[in-house]
Amino acid sequence: MAAALRAPTQQVFVAFEDVAIYFSQEEWELLDEMQRLLYRDVMLENFAVMASLGCWCGAVDEGTPSAESVSVEELSQGRTPKADTSTDKSHPCEICTPVLRDILQMIELHASPCGQKLYLGGASRDFWMSSNLHQLQKLDNGEKLFKVDGDQASFMMNCRFHVSGKPFTFGEVGRDFSATSGLLQHQVTPTIERPHSRIRHLRVPTGRKPLKYTESRKSFREKSVFIQHQRADSGERPYKCSECGKSFSQSSGFLRHRKAHGRTRTHECSECGKSFSRKTHLTQHQRVHTGERPYDCSECGKSFRQVSVLIQHQRVHTGERPYECSECGKSFSHSTNLYRHRSAHTSTRPYECSECGKSFSHSTNLFRHWRVHTGVRPYECSECGKAFSCNIYLIHHQRFHTGERPYVCSECGKSFGQKSVLIQHQRVHTGERPYECSECGKVFSQSSGLFRHRRAHTKTKPYECSECEKSFSCKTDLIRHQTVHTGERPYECSVCGKSFIRKTHLIRHQTVHTNERPYECDECGKSYSQSSALLQHRRVHTGERPYECRECGKSFTRKNHLIQHKTVHTGERPYECSECGKSFSQSSGLLRHRRVHVQ
């Protein structure tokens, strides 16, 4: 992994209080029995991990004993834990132990044939954890999830934790980490049953898994995890926060989030004054100011502030896309991308703008949209001062100054500043047109093309000219039209000086000087400078007249001929002479008339 993870670093001590989660009485009532048991196990695991790293909060005393065997029963009964003497000279401190004791007193411990004990092993500090005996019965053969220790119904987890200075190793995976956060956030390889990122989700790859989910063909040992996975595939988020509107698929995530509203933020950044409820969050935030990026990618050398972001980045190199859509089979490297994609199938847009009524499938999109109304553009270019509403727009813009084009087409070598533009370009080579109109079946290579095309069916023309009130279905068409009023012709021919409203018109004109006519008719051999001209010419041979007037049924080979013809029925005369006020139905008529005044 990253060099920063392999290099020996100074140990940073974290107290158990920093990772403990508290519930109020009201919140506790919302949890079912399985969730309470799960909460207890997680707290015990976190406590054991803290202890396995040496002193539980960093206090070291050479005269104190080591925490070799701590009984949860003793903690829950308010007694000081017993400890055997060891050369490690670490001790349970006065901070961590009371925190765990308070938590255990809150939990309703269910009577069972097995005793509830937590052990911290000898020199290798094996991680021993208590559990319910019925969990053991779920495994019929192979290596068990927990190992029974004599008469005590305590079980050993199938992984080892070593003291700081030695690598943390998963026996099944064989992957080493020199930082606790790296271990806790490690995405376990497919040899482990569930590839989740926290220790409490680890499972040995043997034994029966009775609950099967037909959508993704995955199986689970616990029904609660099975239900949670179903929500992940369906996109269901039934738990909604009444404070901010954020929704969650799991009650545990919802409860953690609710505590964030009422949590005291005691850890303040000395640089900007921003405060955090946890010291670990403050440490991560401070890297924004220091510029520290301790996690390096071994493939490309790119560095990151958080190990979780590094793990996500590495999927770029491995090509791993573990999150698959059950509707269309499309897969994604991040779960957030899959969640966004699902809205394309459901077409749900729950986030509506109170100003204009426009709706969005994600709250972040609504937040960005608000800046259209407020005019806030917080991201400014240091080169030219141009400001943007989104950081990604600024990044794309800065490439105009640097000339950076990191995305290269493997077919023709053409490079682009944005990955999305490269993807669109590659469809020129593949011929892919993935966006199909449900009305007429016409296909497009870009979603924007389909979106504009749909307006032809709905007759929607949202872009109106402020000069003549003529409306258009596309903004680009409106911009082009406005040059009729302004007289602006920004595209000038370098050979003859003739100027044009559109760049495409200039390109077509330049073929007059070069005499280039690459498009030849295979019927009569006549050649043209433009492909569109050849297409129109072929209709002479085929007799095709695709543009028909709905009023009289007359048909035409060109669309502009049909538009001109329609003025016969409407009586419209949009072209007016500025000299005498005479109007015409066609621009050519106005041009001929102007010669009268010139003469």
From Swiss-Prot:
Predominant place of localization: nucleus
Function per UniProt: May be involved in transcriptional regulation.
Cellular component terms (Gene Ontology): nucleus
Stretches assigned to the KRAB domain: 14-94
Zinc finger annotations (C2H2-type) as residue ranges: 239-261, 267-289, 295-317, 323-345, 351-373, 379-401, 407-429, 435-457, 463-485, 491-513, 519-541, 547-569, 575-597
PANTHER family: ZINC FINGER PROTEIN (PTHR24381), ZINC FINGER PROTEIN 819 (PTHR24381:SF448)
Pfam entry (one): zf-C2H2
PROSITE patterns assigned to the protein according to its UniProt record, in alphabetical order: KRAB (PS50805), ZINC_FINGER_C2H2_1 (PS00028), ZINC_FINGER_C2H2_2 (PS50157)
Keywords noted in UniProt: DNA-binding, Metal-binding, Nucleus, Repeat, Transcription, Transcription regulation, Zinc, Zinc-finger
GO biological process: one example: regulation of transcription by RNA polymerase II
Molecular-function annotations in GO: DNA-binding transcription factor activity, RNA polymerase II-specific; RNA polymerase II cis-regulatory region sequence-specific DNA binding; zinc ion binding
Stretches for region Disordered: 68-88
Family, as annotated: Belongs to the krueppel C2H2-type zinc-finger protein family.
CDD domains (alphabetical): KRAB_A-box
Domain of life, per lineage: Eukaryota
InterPro entries from the UniProt entry: KRAB, KRAB_dom_sf, Znf_C2H2_sf, Znf_C2H2_type
SUPFAM superfamilies in UniProt: beta-beta-alpha zinc fingers, KRAB domain (Kruppel-associated box)
Name the record gives this protein: Zinc finger protein 530
Localization, UniProt: Nucleus
